[in-house]
Amino acid sequence: MTSALRVLVCGDHPNLILYTSRFQHAKNIEFYLVNNSKNANYEVSSLFYGTERFQIQNHFQSLLDLVDLNNENGGLVFDLIIMSASSLQEIPQVLRDIKPMMNKTTKILFESSGFIYLEPFIKASVDLSLSNIFSIFTDYDIRRLDNGSYKQFTTANAKSFSVSIGQTTSVHENSYSSDIIPILNTFQKLFQKLFPRDVVTLYDHSPSAFLAKEWELALPQICFDPLLIILEEKNPSTLDDHVLAKPLISGLLGESLLIIKKMGIAMNNPNFQNEQTILKHWKNKCEDLPDGPALLYNFIHKASSLNIDLLLLQPILLADDFGVKTPYLECLFTMMTQYQLLNKGDSEWFIRKDENTALTRVDDLQNSIALKDGKIMQLQNSESTLKNEIKELQSQVLSLKQEVSSSKANNGQELEILKKKVQMGDNSLFDRPNSNTNGISPSDNIVDVDLNYERSDQGNNSSGNDSRRQSFFNSTSDTTLSRDETSLKERELEVRMKELELQERELELQRKALQQQQQYQQRPPKQVYSGPSGTPTSGNNNNKSYNPNRKSSYSQPQHVAMMTSRGLHGPSAASSSPVISANNFVDPVSSGTPYSSNSSRFSQQIPSQQYMHTVKPTSRKNRSSVMPNIGYVPGLTNNEYGRKFNGNGMNGTQSRLNSLSNQSTFRSQQGPPITQQKSFQNNGGSMRTNRIPSANYNISNQQSGFVNSISSPNLSNLENRNTVQNSRNADSAPCVNQLNSDSPPQLQSLSQNGTSKVPQINITQPSPIQTNFATSDNPAAVIKLGTPSEDTVSAAATANNISTMGDESRKEDVKEKKKKKFSFFGKRKK
């Protein structure tokens, strides 16, 4: 089985499409086509073979694409190459590109219809053997109509067409060499199969006969067709009527015939003997052609290349080789080259007039007008759409303005309401601390007792709450109308939260007061105070036992008189009902509620007499003392009890109270102890007080509290001489204040039990010293140094009874120390 014949057709000449169409009917052929057509589908119409439509599988728009394919795959070698060129410079370039795809047996057929003697030029371009280069031409007039469509132009009475294959190796040779003839015979057989209705001729293997046939086809195209373009003549029959055409025709034909003669070619055809016969034969051939010769057709329709180099330059080069002067041919070549540039639109000064140009321009203008009209319609539609959108937006703006105005009005009303609420809240908050919370009327002119009523749930957060409340007042006072609705709502919520917080605190105070009232109502009966564990007894240090029925060293009337005079410093116990404040808080001082304790140390009942001897008279007779009292205030766990003297309670209207009369008597006991110190106000002399040492309590029975001691540099002698020990309730933590000579009084806390509550101690001084204690778990204890409160008077009564016990144990030293003064009144120096 023989391998397929690999054929390459390369070029843009219309005759190559004719050959391609005929190769599609051959078998066992691998066909490749390279041209500038963008479409691989073709249609060819001919007189004998009709219309043929075909598609090329191996189609390439340029020769470089084929070269790239060969570089990728490799091994692509063609057996036959049929090629054409538009200029002499293109021939060597094409041959160099396809040379890698050629071998020694590759045959080249160059399209030479209208051209002469190109084989020597091809051989000189590349190093190829002349035996492999041949020429092919035909009398078919194939013209390109449009892209991919070709048609044969001919007369209707044509009988046959010819295809000629040969070689022009030497002008003077009459026959080919023995190696060329078999190749030509093979070509003849091949093309005879491709063109069965045409004549494939070799001209009896005569190179001179083949060259003479080339001149017969090329002579009219060289001398007459270019003149039609130059003289702008479409009808060949009237060309010789031009005055300028006759000398040009004569000059061109004379030079061409001279070249033929120099080449030794005999023109045996009677139609090509002289100028008249050649012109007549040309007119007869072009008479039946509707569009004139092919060169004029290609110039007018710009269908194909004019091939000016191959058509005119090659005869000039031949004439130069044979020593023939060709001025007409050279002038014609120059003019046709410029016309070719003008036809392509490459001229800088001239432009071709085209009949279709005006129509094309009109069509272009109409198309542009239609496009602009379409754009105008689109713009109008978009304009109407935008207008509708503008109307909608304007309506939305109006509605939004109405909403804004209404919202402004509503916000203004809400702002006024919030301002009123804030003002009412401010007034209620500032008026509430001035309200009467302890049951004592403002007309009592209470100035000497500090009553610290505080909420038990406040703790260390009291200062934080005050700061937050103050910041809230500042923030509410700075409210302006420029705040938006969100800030107004936030402030309204904040005000409501503050109001709820105040209401919760008020309810908590009422609950605490109610619990306190129930606690006072559920107190056990009065018990005898036996003194703390450190009190001297018969079994301790040989001290004399304490006699509770000890006779008073002064008479009852004197005692009553003294207590009457001292009633200015204490509350009244004659009131039968306790005083209840606005928060249902029972004032234990003014109510005169007796002291009660659950401690196991009070093992004895107090005797039937109501009052103990509280103060031992001094040597200054029954002179009433104007010294301030030092009282003891127990903690919340020890309950409150009033101070009574000789059965006659102090009148509440005569009580002197210092400091805060509107505060709650219970302070929240949270946080670490905070010492507050007030300046001493001199009420008649310096304070002289006895040292109160802490009792010797058992640690197992002792609850958490505070241990304070009080000392003074003025009492150094009294400290050495006074050994009286005063005890307090064992249920409360002991508190002893000590005044150091080096530093001001300090309060030191010893927290022993987190669950115990801290007592309150009020010690009479010329001016009050207020001290707050706080722990993390217990409410803060409040220690106030100043004029005794009602609690202090009650605590002082018990303390005076204890001091009387100490006096009974030291009867033997009365005479020696008769100028001394006991109980809580310090020694008064003259």
From Swiss-Prot:
Q: Where is the composition biased (Polar residues)?
A: 433-444, 651-699, 796-806
Keywords in alphabetical order = Coiled coil, Phosphoprotein
Q: Which residues cross the membrane?
A: none
- List the residue ranges of the region (Disordered): 426-488, 513-558, 648-699, 727-757, 796-830
Stated family: Belongs to the PAM1/SVL3 family.
Q: Which Pfam families match?
A: ApbA_C (PF08546)
Full protein name: Protein PAM1
Q: Low complexity compositional bias: what residue ranges?
A: 513-527, 538-555, 738-753
Positions with biased composition (Basic and acidic residues): 807-816
Q: What else is known?
A: Present with 300 molecules/cell in log phase SD medium.
Cellular component, GO, one term? cellular bud neck
Q: Which residues carry this modification: Phosphoserine?
A: S659, S732, S767
Q: List where this protein forms a coiled coil.
A: 379-400, 481-514
Compositional bias per record (Basic residues), positions renumbered to this chain: 817-830
Its biological function? Not known. It is a suppressor of protein phosphatase 2A depletion.
GO biological process entries? pseudohyphal growth
